[in-house]
């Protein structure tokens, strides 16, 4: 790369301009003030609230049914063993009572 030539002794070099003359000549335009948003009428909000209340009520009902269904499924799963034989909860209770009778004798 060629080296820069040293300026002559009598000449003063100006600093390079970063902005063009066109941009520096014009001041920045002022930003327009934002307009305030219009407030919605209260009547429309009340109508929307009623609709939301109805939606919430129906959602609650669906959720309760879903919980009941899962409880029933859990109960069914407890009654079935992995190999397909059914287990009864009464059998262990009967064995426990037999053990108590044997101990008392």
From Swiss-Prot:
Superkingdom of source: Eukaryota
GO molecular function: chromatin binding; nucleosomal DNA binding
Keyword Nucleus: yes
Function: Binds to the inner side of the nucleosomal DNA thus altering the interaction between the DNA and the histone octamer. May be involved in the process which maintains transcribable genes in a unique chromatin conformation.
InterPro entries cross-referenced by the UniProt entry: HMGN_fam
Family as reported in the entry's similarity comment: Belongs to the HMGN family.
Native organism: Gallus gallus (Chicken)
SMART domains, per database record: HMG17 (SM00527)
Subcellular location field: Nucleus
One GO BP annotation of this record: chromatin organization
Keyword line: DNA-binding, Nucleus
GO cellular component annotations of the record: chromatin; nucleus
Note: There are two HMG-14 proteins in chicken: HMG-14A the major component, and HMG-14B the minor component.
Keyword Electron transport: no
Region (Disordered): 1-105
Ranges of biased composition (kind: Basic and acidic residues): 1-18, 32-56, 65-88
Stated name of the protein: Non-histone chromosomal protein HMG-14A
């Amino acid at each position: 790369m060629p080296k820069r030539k040293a300026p002559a002794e009598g000449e003063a070099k100006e600093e390079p301009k970063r902005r063009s003359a066109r941009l520096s000549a014009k001041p920045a335009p002022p930003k327009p003030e934002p307009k305030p948003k219009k407030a919605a009428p209260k009547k429309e909000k009340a109508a929307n609230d009623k609709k939301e209340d109805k939606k919430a009520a129906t959602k609650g009902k669906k959720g309760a049914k879903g919980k009941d269904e899962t409880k029933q499924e859990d109960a069914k799963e407890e009654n079935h063993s992995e190999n397909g034989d059914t287990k009864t909860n009464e059998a262990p209770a009967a064995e426990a009572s037999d053990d108590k009778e044997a101990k008392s004798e």
